[in-house]
Amino acid sequence: MSKEAIIIQNKKRIIYEIYFPAFCRDFQDLANKIPYFVELGVTTLWLTPIFPSPTEHGYDIINHFDIKKEYGSFRDFDNFIEKAHENELEVLLDLVLCHTSSEHLMFKESIQGKNDCYFWSNHKLDDAWKICNENKQYYLAKWYYTMPQLNNQSAQVRTLIKVLIKFWLVEHKVDGFRLDAIKYASGDPIEFWKWFCKEVYKIKPNAYLVGECWEEFEISNKYAIETGMKTFNFEQAGWMKNKILHNSRYEVRNDINNAVIFLDNHDMTRISVDCNFNVDKIKNLLKLMFTFNHNDICIYYGTEIGMGVPNGYVHCGGHGDFHSRTKMNWYEVERQRRDPNSIFNYIKKLIHEYKSK
């Protein structure tokens, strides 16, 4: 069995979400941080979008077959993948397949009527339809006017995706994908993702796929059961927080084998803020996640040191977004390493015990 296959199989995964622009400079810098991931005990690295994009977050992709120039070259990327695999770490790329950037070549060609990869209308059907000044038609953009909706039923789009899958899984040896906003795929979302998973598993049978479905568990689990991917369990994240913060009843579910358990991410308020920076509450919340679950677990960068809103920032309602995407505090890592009672050393212990079960 190849080294690559061993990395994938028989593993209770501890996924570590890396919000790339806040965590490291480039792929050389990230490769140098691999000993940190090994020390922490995580098994899988999820990289938020690394593709060319006009925004920092990168969820509006200009080219799915390239890397942001400031992140380095493909040689740098491949060297990072090789070093990760040498240390038995998996790497997941964040794929956005429900929309693209309006700067994507495919969208520019669609404006000229050269493909059916997006949705067009002569009339504004509702507020999700935006005017295109070049052809005077309306295009569908559910998120923002710079993020036109992809036609996931288009043969051209699916051909592109098949090439894309092979490009990253085979040529650049990534181990799987985190799939963005899966319920927003156009047409029949479950049919599309079932097709996608089938194409991935044909190329790499042991690839790891996990989808973002910000819904109650029954809905997100339906995607997992019917498509073959795993899904993040947003509902359980809320249950765990309510248990620790408000002493609400918490029931352990035995039907969540397809779920990935987590507490926060790049779209949410950090748990340190939820806990008002109370170290005991943060530790209790982490303990609850690791103790009463047998699923794969995902940790957001900085959670291991109780990172939160810097001084002078004002906490705002809704998504945590900007305030949850601040630079990784490496000085705090060094400080907590030396403190046997720190969150950092506590979560290391929890991870070790969890993997040993």
Tell me the role of every PLM-derived stretch.
Residues 284-293:
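Short, hydrophobic/amphipathic alpha-helical patches that form generic packing surfaces
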Residues 255-277:
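Active-site clefts of carbohydrate-active enzymes
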Residues 81, 85, 89, 107, ...:
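Active-site-proximal helices and loops of the catalytic beta/alpha 8
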Residues 3-28, 36-43, 50-172, 195-204, ...:
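Substrate-binding/active-site clefts of carbohydrate-active enzymes
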Residues 29, 72-76, 153-161, 188-192, ...:
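Soluble or luminal CAZymes and related metallo-dependent hydrolases
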Residues 1-52, 78, 83-84, 245-251, ...:
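Carbohydrate-interacting/catalytic domains
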Residues 14-18, 45-47, 91-93, 177, ...:
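Hydrophobic faces of well-ordered beta-strands that scaffold small-molecule active sites
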Residues 20-24, 51, 68, 97, ...:
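Short, flexible loop/turn elements at secondary-structure junctions
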